[in-house]
Each structure stands twice: as structure tokens, then as C-alpha cells.
């Protein structure tokens, strides 16, 4: 997005403003909420790659003596965005804190995927109001996907006037300017771009750990499933250039990271927006096989774009793991059509067959929605039968939650809640049954585990994950944290495995 487009999406009097790329010129408060109607549009505007991000001199030591706190809701993409915002705060001179009471600035990085996530955010805003009363200089910000919704921004402006700033998913690189504006404004500063921005490289990051890292390979989604708000909140599909991704991953490998997760709302669409080269996710994964790093995985996949070349590359193994998260949402072709998933039950099963043929040890997990409008008992049974036929290791299961602004929200929600809950319970029983059955096959096997750290339930126990994303708990020295070890599985549980260390750190080959 260029500056002209940014102003047009935010200010009613945009035609009177200077159409310059120098964002620092604009500090005036903006009070117009975003537009989901505008966010749906997919124009031909060129998305630029900006590689010269830098902090203007005026912001040096801007945050010295101040502390920040970011609370993150939702997906890995939000976690990655938080790492970027933490990097910007640190570059400004702020120090991190793990307490809202100790912070000078609190950001809530929000998720819009379900109503429950939004309720949590508004509940937290209520708690923060007392801190604002005690300290008028205390800054509260709301960012992330919720900020891209008109109804949310309007609710904040009307009922949560103690919030100082609201910004969205497309302009987190403008955080220094938004902070400065919020400090001196007497009203809520709203800077939400309805349309996506450029791809900004070289943004600072404070990564959550030094063992595993998330790397964005693309942004946005053009699939417009009828239930999903993401294409509106994250914008159109924009791919990072492969050389930028490979350089970032090589840098992480050189700094000792063992595992990389490639991120995108739909990673299988990677490269489809390139006009100068034919290059997709399979090509990228083939190049990343040559990088000296132990494991590479990706999320989230869309069955519609999962092509044969990618399957062929994944079958080569090496540092490409055998775990694939492949959301199906429903086992009924009729339901999939209403959801606008653009594939059938048969297409999905054929894709699974190809994956298992190329990767015999592949572990598949999925997402499933129950109680979508018009879902019949027979259609739900199709979902149950597909789950058994594929033999998923586990699934994230949800009761349908209408999201304002999506086509499905206009459909009659005609499945009674008691029916939705009963279906979810039945599905979860099946998920749990297959999960313990799948995990039991690991008993007696020796598996490779990347040690994450101490178990959340017992600090005397170490916890880590296999290549197939199985949680393994075992007793060993804490010096092994961050290392790849061999563990013999002694006990299988529904959601985890217990084992014994049989071999200390192994070399990455």
C-alpha cells in the first residue's frame, strides 16, 4: 500500500493531504474505523518489498526508562508479530516486563477467529482500566486481527475510551509513530489500514526462544472460506522473496536454532503472486533441505493448493519433518461447498493417499468445525467416517462461531446448541480414542527429541518434541535443553509420551 492508499482508507479528507511516502509527516489522530468491505477487495496494486526499514533519529532512546508488556492471543502468526513489536520496543529503548502493573505500555495483540477470543480481550481491557485510573500516563493499545473489524473499533471508541491506541495487522512497522501520537493525543488514536501494506523486511525481532523460530514466508489469504474472517483482517496473499527467507533461515541456523516453522495463513499459496518467476512452496522447501538446520516444518496448509511437487519434495525427508497439519473442516462435500473450501471429500482423501504413499511415516493432524449452518446428522457422520478413514493423530475441534462480516454470519444458524455440543463431544471422543491408539504404537520405540525445556507440570522432568510433533517427557540433565537426544518411549498417553534417555546429544546431519 502506498501513502495515498493509506490515507484514503483512513481519512475522510484524504484528498487534501500530501501524498508522500514519508510516513513521519503524519502524526494527526485518525478516528475512522476500518472497512471490511474495503478489506475484501483484491486489486492489482503492486506490493512492494521494503528492505530499508530503520528507526529515525528522533526515536533514539524514545523509550529509555520505560517498560512494555505484550499479551498475545491466537495463532503463531500473532506470536511472530509480537516478536517484531517487541523488537521495535527494544530498539526504542523500552525494557520488557512480565507484569501489566509494572508496565508503562501494554499492548493486547488480538485474535478475531472466534467470539470467545474477543470476549477475553474486552475482559482484559476492563481489568486494565483500574491501572489507567491510577496512572493517567499508562498507555493501553489494541492491535492484531480484532482491530481490523469495524464493530470492534467502534466498541472500543464508545465503551473503552481508556484505550489510547488501536492499530491493525498491516502497519505494525509504524509502532514508533503510533506510540508518539498516543502519548500526546487526548483521544484514542486509531490507525488501521483496511488494505494490506507492503512486505517490510529487516524489521527487528526479539524471538521467544533460542531453540525454535517462526519465519513468515507469506502474508494474507485469498480463499474467503465463508466462515473465516482472516482474509479480511490479514489482506491479500503476499509472498516474501525466496532469497530473503533463505537468508533469514541461514542466519538462524548459524545462531544455533534447531527448528524452523514456516508461517502463512495459507503456505501452500506461497509464490502464486510472483510475476517474474515460477516458484512455489515445493521449490522453497527443496532449497531449505540444503540448509544446515535439524528440522523444518510449516503451517497452515490448505488442501486446495497442496500440490504434487510439494509432496515429492517432502518425500525426500532430511530436515523436512513428517508431520503435516492439513485442515479438512468437514467430511461432507456438501458442507465443504457451503464453506467455500473449493475441494471435495474425494479430493481430500486422494491428497492424503498421495502424501502417505510418498511419506510412509507421515503424521496428519487437522481442524474440524461442527454445527456449521445446515449441517445434518448425516453430514456430521461423514466427518466422523472421514476422520477414521484418514486416521488422524489428533485434531483441533470447534463449534461453529459466526464472525460478523463473513458470508456465513448471514446464514441462519439453524443447528441447536445442544446438538452442536453433542456432536463435538462425540467427535472429541473419537479424536481421543485414535490419539491414544496412535501414541501407543510408539511404546518401545527410540525417537529423536528436540528438548524444549522443563515440563510445565514438573520442573524435574524435561519436555521436548519428536519430528512428528509428539510431546515427550523424560528425566535427564537440564544441560540437554536445546539439544537433540534419543529417547526410548516407555508409556503412551492421549496427548503425550513418557520415556527414558538412551543417548545424549546427537549431531545434526
From Swiss-Prot:
PROSITE patterns: MTTASE_N, MTTASE_RADICAL, RADICAL_SAM, TRAM. It catalyses: N(6)-dimethylallyladenosine(37) in tRNA + (sulfur carrier)-SH + AH2 + 2 S-adenosyl-L-methionine = 2-methylsulfanyl-N(6)-dimethylallyladenosine(37) in tRNA + (sulfur carrier)-H + 5'-deoxyadenosine + L-methionine + A + S-adenosyl-L-homocysteine + 2 H(+). Its main location: cytoplasm. Binds 2 [4Fe-4S] clusters. One cluster is coordinated with 3 cysteines and an exchangeable S-adenosyl-L-methionine. It comes from the Bacteria. [4Fe-4S] cluster 1 binds at residues 75, 111, 145. This is tRNA-2-methylthio-N(6)-dimethylallyladenosine synthase. It comes from Bacillus cereus (strain ATCC 14579 / DSM 31 / CCUG 7414 / JCM 2152 / NBRC 15305 / NCIMB 9373 / NCTC 2599 / NRRL B-3711).
Amino acid at each position: 500500500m502506498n501513502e495515498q492508499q493509506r490515507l484514503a482508507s483512513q481519512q475522510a479528507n484524504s484528498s487534501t493531504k500530501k501524498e508522500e511516502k514519508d510516513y513521519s509527516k503524519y502524526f494527526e489522530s485518525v478516528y475512522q474505523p476500518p472497512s471490511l468491505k474495503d478489506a475484501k477487495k483484491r486489486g492489482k496494486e503492486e506490493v512492494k518489498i521494503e528492505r530499508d526499514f530503520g528507526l529515525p533519529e528522533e526515536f533514539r532512546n524514545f523509550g529509555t526508562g520505560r517498560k512494555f508488556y505484550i499479551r498475545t492471543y491466537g495463532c503463531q502468526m500473532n506470536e511472530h508479530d509480537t516478536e517484531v513489536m517487541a523488537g521495535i520496543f527494544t530498539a526504542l529503548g523500552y525494557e520488557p516486563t512480565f507484569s501489566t502493573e509494572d508496565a508503562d505500555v501494554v499492548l493486547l495483540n488480538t485474535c478475531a477467529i472466534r467470539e470467545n477470543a474477543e470476549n477475553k480481550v474486552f475482559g482484559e481491557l476492563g481489568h486494565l482500566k483500574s491501572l489507567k485510573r491510577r496512572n493517567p500516563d499508562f498507555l493501553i493499545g489494541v492491535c492484531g486481527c480484532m482491530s481490523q473489524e469495524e464493530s470492534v473499533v467502534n466498541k472500543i471508541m464508545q465503551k473503552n475510551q481508556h484505550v489510547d491506541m488501536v492499530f491493525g495487522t498491516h502497519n505494525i512497522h509504524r509502532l514508533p509513530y503510533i506510540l508518539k501520537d498516543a502519548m500526546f493525543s487526548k483521544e484514542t488514536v486509531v490507525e488501521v489500514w483496511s488494505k494490506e501494506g507492503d512486505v517490510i523486511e529487516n524489521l527487528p525481532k526479539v524471538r521467544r526462544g533460542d531453540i525454535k523460530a517462526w519465519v513468515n514466508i507469506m502474508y494474507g489469504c485469498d480463499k474467503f472460506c465463508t466462515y473465516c474472517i482472516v482474509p479480511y483482517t490479514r489482506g491479500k496473499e503476499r509472498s516474501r522473496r525466496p532469497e530473503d527467507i533463505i537468508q533469514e533461515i541461514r542466519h538462524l541456523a548459524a545462531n544455533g536454532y534447531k527448528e524452523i516453522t514456516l508461517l502463512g495463513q495459507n503456505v501452500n499459496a506461497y509464490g502464486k503472486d510472483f510475476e517474474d518467476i515460477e516458484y512455489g512452496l515445493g521449490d522453497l522447501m527443496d532449497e531449505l533441505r540444503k540448509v544446515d538446520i535439524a528440522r523444518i516444518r510449516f503451517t497452515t496448509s490448505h488442501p486446495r493448493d497442496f500440490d504434487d511437487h510439494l509432496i515429492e519434495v517432502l518425500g525426500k525427508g532430511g530436515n523436512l519433518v513428517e508431520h503435516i497439519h492439513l485442515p479438512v473442516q468437514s467430511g461432507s462435500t456438501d458442507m465443504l461447498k457451503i464453506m467455500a473450501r473449493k475441494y471435495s471429500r474425494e479430493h481430500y482423501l486422494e491428497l492424503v493417499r498421495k502424501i502417505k504413499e510418498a511419506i510412509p511415516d507421515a503424521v496428519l493432524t487437522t481442524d474440524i468445525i461442527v454445527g456449521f449452518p445446515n449441517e445434518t446428522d448425516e453430514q456430521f457422520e461423514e466427518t466422523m467416517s472421514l476422520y477414521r478413514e484418514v486416521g488422524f493423530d489428533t485434531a483441533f475441534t470447534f463449534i461453529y462461531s459466526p464472525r460478523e462480516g463473513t458470508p456465513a454470519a448471514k446464514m441462519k444458524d439453524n443447528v441447536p446448541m445442544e446438538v452442536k455440543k453433542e456432536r463435538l463431544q462425540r467427535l472429541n471422543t473419537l479424536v481421543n480414542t485414535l490419539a491414544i491408539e496412535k501414541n501407543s504404537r510408539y511404546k518401545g520405540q527410540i525417537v529423536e527429541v528436540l528438548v524444549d525445556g522443563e515440563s510445565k507440570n514438573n520442573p524435574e522432568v524435561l519436555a521436548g518434541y519428536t519430528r512428528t510433533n509428539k510431546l515427550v517427557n523424560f528425566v535427564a540433565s537440564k544441560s540437554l535443553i536445546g539439544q537433540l537426544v534419543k529417547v526410548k518411549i516407555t508409556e503412551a498417553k492421549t496427548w503425550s509420551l513418557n520415556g527414558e534417555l538412551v543417548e545424549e546429544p546427537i549431531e545434526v546431519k
